[in-house]
UniProtKB/Swiss-Prot annotation:
It comes from the Bacteria. Its cofactor is [4Fe-4S] cluster; [2Fe-2S] cluster. It catalyses: (4R,5S)-dethiobiotin + (sulfur carrier)-SH + 2 reduced [2Fe-2S]-[ferredoxin] + 2 S-adenosyl-L-methionine = (sulfur carrier)-H + biotin + 2 5'-deoxyadenosine + 2 L-methionine + 2 oxidized [2Fe-2S]-[ferredoxin]. One of its GO terms (biological process) is biotin biosynthetic process. This is Biotin synthase. PANTHER family: BIOTIN SYNTHASE (PTHR22976), BIOTIN SYNTHASE, MITOCHONDRIAL (PTHR22976:SF2). InterPro entries: Aldolase_TIM, BATS_dom, Biotin_synth/BioAB, Biotin_synthase, Elp3/MiaA/NifB-like_rSAM, rSAM. Pathway: Cofactor biosynthesis; biotin biosynthesis; biotin from 7,8-diaminononanoate: step 2/2.
Length: 336
């Protein structure tokens, strides 16, 4: 098995468009996932080096531009109106505040600015304000990303015309396990939004969360779904659940660190040209665990003290870790 992977690791030669013949299956992905840990990381590092500078990390900053009051019942989220998290709903943030925070993000080394709103989908009355945020943030010299819930084709086109670079809409988990986590929005709804985003010419950011109570096969199957999209996401965020007080999953069991690193490696092997982002949960990861994730192919992180409503490693810790690992921040010229 190892010799086969070394000579032609499934995924390395894949192009953006795939046929049914070379589509991933749970069985083919599981074969890689089950490799001895050292072999899996060796293969992932080889694929990573073939597609990226292994010592550069893309830095993004995430800002919550509208907090709480979301009508969705996502079991992991403190911003859901279904959960007694104590989080107060806010109105849409002003453009001036968004731009002030965007400039701080750029000054900290971020090349992409991600703006998230706790909505099921944007309301028509908010679309002009969102479009203006995109235009003004781009004018600062940053890539833009939005995560606003479901989008219609017209909404995706509106934001594309404003210059939106990326749209984040995670599929969260496997199609099989999805109804155990969310009941107010279907798995197909999520895939439909991703299709609208792609058709509008916006780059796709989509990944999932580990630690929801899913099985290993669910985690792998989530990656199969993403890798088998007509064009895989340009950005694949992999989150480790942060159990939020008041949420339905506040007592969820922690994720095994080795299993988490395996998923990072598998994402790299299955989507070799995508940025794999080490996302939520880094604050509770040891430096050693993060180092393994970078070796396994993660090459993007969110910087800043907070990630929506959860804690994130501060700038000092990230700077120290990157210095000790010999990693440098990516620039737009390097990853555009």
């Amino acid at each position: 098995m190892l010799n086969m992977v070394q000579s032609n690791p499934k995924g390395v030669e894949k192009t953006a468009s795939k046929s049914e013949q070379d589509a991933w299956t749970l069985a083919s992905a599981r074969l890689l996932y089950d490799l001895p840990f050292n072999d899996l990381l060796f293969e992932a590092q080889n694929v990573h080096r073939a597609n990226f500078d292994p010592n550069r990390v893309q830095l993004s900053k995430l800002l919550n531009i509208k907090t709480g009051g979301c009508p969705e019942d996502c079991g992991y989220c403190s911003q859901s109106a279904h959960h007694a998290s104590g989080l107060k709903a806010s109105k849409l943030m002003s453009l001036d505040t968004v731009l002030e925070e965007a400039q701080k993000a750029k000054d900290s080394g971020a090349t992409r600015y991600c703006m998230g709103a706790a909505w099921r989908s944007p309301k028509p009355r908010d679309e002009p304000a969102i479009a203006e945020m995109v235009k003004q943030v781009k004018a600062l010299g940053l890539e833009t990303c939005m995560t606003l819930g479901m989008l219609s084709p017209d909404q995706a086109q509106t934001f594309a015309e404003a210059g939106l670079d990326y749209y984040n809409h995670n599929i969260d988990t496997s199609e099989r396990f999805y109804p155990q986590v969310i009941t107010t929005r279907s798995f197909d709804d999520r895939l439909e939004t991703l299709a609208h985003v792609r058709e509008a010419g916006i780059k796709v950011c989509s990944g999932g969360i580990l630690g929801l109570g899913e099985t290993e096969d669910d985690r792998i199957d989530m990656l199969v779904t993403l890798a088998n999209l007509p064009t895989p996401p340009e950005s694949v965020p992999i989150n480790m659940l942060i159990p939020m007080p008041g949420s339905r999953l506040e007592k969820a069991s922690p994720v095994d660190p080795i299993a988490f690193v395996r998923i990072i490696a598998l994402a790299r092997l299955m989507m070799p040209q995508s940025h794999v982002r080490l996302t939520a949960g880094r604050n509770s990861m040891s430096d050693e665990m993060q180092a393994l994730c970078f070796f396994a192919g993660a090459n993007s992180i969110f910087i800043g003290d907070t990630l929506l409503t959860a804690a994130n490693p501060g700038e000092d810790r990230d700077t120290s870790l990157m210095r000790r690992l010999g990693l440098t921040a990516d620039t737009l010229d390097n990853h555009a």
